[in-house]
């Protein structure tokens, strides 16, 4: 990160606010060069006008697919909020409504790629392959950059011109390499996750091949305008500072995830990944098999928060999901999942997904508070930790 900032001559002038059209915004343009350099892409789009990770993914998909094209997922069903973007669940403005078809190949029971059926699924209309790095609300392992590279190589050998896009949410700075370094054409993510370092108040990014990024820019703004417009308003310094802090913040979040895995594995719960496995994102899944324990866990995470610690999280019908979802996130930035947070759908197997913590110490406190809530309700036997 430091090298990328130095090579692209980041200066104090880059932190100046722009408004209106945002023409000649030095800070915005330089930041996009920093992202491209750091993630090894030809170009980047890093904007506060991209509201969340789902928005960034929808933008990347809709700008690089045309009616008659087919989108294919070789790693099973995508994250819940993308179902309406794609049209798996009907929604206005979906890809399906614009004549883009969708196919998917599920992972094999052992979590490996089903290469035989992936080969069968690729056809003349397959324009873009989407690879979700993180597990989402599933209980499969997160994909390593190495495995993603192997999958992309297999796909490109079958159809060299297919666009391979990686949903990089929760994975930035966890490994030494990023997906663009192993053959991906685009990586997409959110600034209120890893790369924002807990300081970015909003935003998303798309980094990769120049043509793919340009297509996304024209979709975000307007044909003919592209990257030339889009004021950075007053958030640009937090984008830079958050990106600078991101590797350290991610490191603390990883320590918290490992701690959670070890604690809950000793208590007899199923955890993915376990306490000794390699990490490829910041998410720790714990399966409780009942809603009471799942809700108590989230209440403990909320009670450890610096913001809204007095609030009791409750399941609700969150937009984009097909079941009630509970979310614990006493965060400075609403919905920030690089801050201490936990969430999950209230449905079997009642798995909760823990992530974040701007410091390792805060992540540790959150886990201990979650344990306290479970103990108070006799939902766990803490003697197993002795």
Where in this protein do the model-derived segments appear?
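N-terminal entrance/gating region of PLP-dependent enzymes' catalytic architecture
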Residues: 1-30, 325, 345-354
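Conserved PLP-enzyme active-site core in the AAT-like
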Residues: 2, 6-7, 11-14, 22-23, ...
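Short glycine-rich or small-residue beta-strand-to-loop segments that form or flank ligand, phosphate
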Residues: 14, 18, 45-48, 282-287
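Long amphipathic N-terminal alpha/beta scaffold segment
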Residues: 18-22, 26-44, 56
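A generic structural signal for short, non-catalytic loop/turn and secondary-structure boundary residues
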Residues: 39-40, 95-100, 277, 345
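Conserved C-terminal alpha-helix-loop-beta "cap" of PLP-dependent enzymes
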Residues: 265-385
């Amino acid at each position: 990160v430091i090298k990328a900032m130095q090579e692209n001559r980041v200066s104090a002038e880059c932190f100046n606010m722009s408004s209106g059209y945002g023409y000649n915004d030095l800070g915005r343009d330089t930041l996009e060069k920093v992202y491209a350099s750091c993630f090894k892409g030809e170009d980047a789009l890093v904007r506060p006008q991209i509201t969340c990770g789902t928005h960034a993914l929808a933008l990347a998909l809709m700008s690089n697919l045309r009616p008659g094209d087919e989108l294919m997922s070789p790693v099973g069903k995508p994250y819940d909020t993308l179902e309406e973007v794609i049209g798996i669940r009907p929604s206005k403005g979906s890809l399906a409504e614009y004549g883009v078809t969708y196919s998917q190949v599920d992972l094999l029971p052992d979590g490996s790629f089903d290469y035989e059926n992936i080969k069968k699924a690729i056809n003349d209309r397959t324009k873009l392959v989407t690879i979700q790095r993180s597990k989402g609300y599933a209980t499969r392992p997160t994909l390593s950059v190495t495995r993603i590279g192997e999958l992309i190589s297999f796909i490109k050998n079958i159809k060299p011109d297919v666009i391979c896009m990686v949903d990089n949410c929760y994975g930035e700075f966890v490994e030494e390499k990023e997906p663009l370094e192993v053959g991906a054409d685009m990586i997409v993510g959110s600034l209120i996750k890893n790369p924002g370092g807990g300081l970015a108040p909003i935003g998303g990014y798309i980094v990769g091949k120049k043509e793919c990024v340009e297509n996304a820019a024209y979709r975000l703004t307007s044909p003919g305008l592209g990257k030339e417009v889009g004021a950075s308003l007053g958030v640009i310094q937090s984008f830079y500072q958050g990106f600078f802090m991101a590797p350290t913040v991610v490191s603390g979040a990883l320590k918290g995830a490992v701690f959670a895995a070890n604690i809950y594995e000793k208590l007899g719960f199923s955890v993915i990944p376990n306490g000794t496995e390699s990490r490829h994102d910041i998410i720790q899944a714990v399966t409780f098999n009942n809603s009471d324990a799942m809700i108590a866990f989230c209440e403990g995470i909320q009670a450890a928060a610096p913001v809204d610690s007095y609030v009791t999280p409750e399941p609700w019908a969150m937009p984009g999901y097909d079941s009630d979802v509970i979310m614990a996130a006493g965060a400075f930035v609403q919905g920030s999942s690089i801050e201490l947070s936990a969430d999950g759908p209230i449905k079997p197997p009642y798995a909760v997904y823990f992530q974040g913590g701007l410091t390792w110490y805060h992540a540790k406190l959150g886990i201990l508070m979650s344990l306290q809530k479970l103990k108070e309700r006799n939902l766990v036997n803490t003697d197993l930790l002795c």
